[in-house]
A protein has these predicted regions:
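Short, functional N-terminal and low-complexity linear motifs
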Residues: 17-23, 48-53
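Glycine-rich S-adenosyl-L-methionine
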Residues: 32-60
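C-terminal catalytic and target-recognition region of SAM-dependent MTase-like enzymes
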Residues: 1-15, 19-21, 27, 42, ...
Length: 138
């Protein structure tokens, strides 16, 4: 896929808004659970891993890749990034300066984040589930 269009140039930054189960937007899109199958989280996690692995070589040394999903499932968020960094010694989780307040930090602190998610909360506390991780190439 990448080899078909890539010129060999490395990039300073890449945003990977990965395809996901959209489990974090059920509040706004109540049809999401009805359009998903039990195997979707695992299938999409494999696709996310494939995309991460395909894009990582395109990030120049010192560059960054921002990975995000609108999923609340660990396999599409923190577990995905833990697996990726375990398999890529040149990938380092990076603190995200200026991140919105009210975020819940996961392990390691201040590096991987997900917005608190409560679909039954009253406005204005209601918001979508979201995950992001900023990776820097060493």
């Amino acid at each position: 896929m990448v080899s078909e269009w890539h010129s060999g140039r490395e990039f300073d930054a890449i945003l990977l808004d990965a395809p996901c189960t959209a489990s974090g937007i059920v509040r706004r899109q109540p049809d999401v659970p009805w359009s998903r199958r039990p195997e979707d989280p695992a299938r999409l996690a494999r696709e996310q891993a494939r995309l991460l692995n395909a894009l990582w070589p395109l990030v120049k040394k010192g560059g960054r890749l921002l990975y995000c999903t609108c999923s609340i499932f660990p396999e599409e968020g923190p577990d995905q990034i833990r697996r990726f960094t375990a398999n890529h010694g040149d990938a380092q989780l990076t603190a995200f300066k200026g991140a919105p307040t009210g975020m819940m930090s996961l392990v390691p602190a201040d590096h991987v984040h997900e917005l608190p998610f409560n679909p039954n909360a009253a406005e204005p506390l209601v918001h979508d589930g979201f995950f992001y991780a900023l990776l820097t190439k060493l």
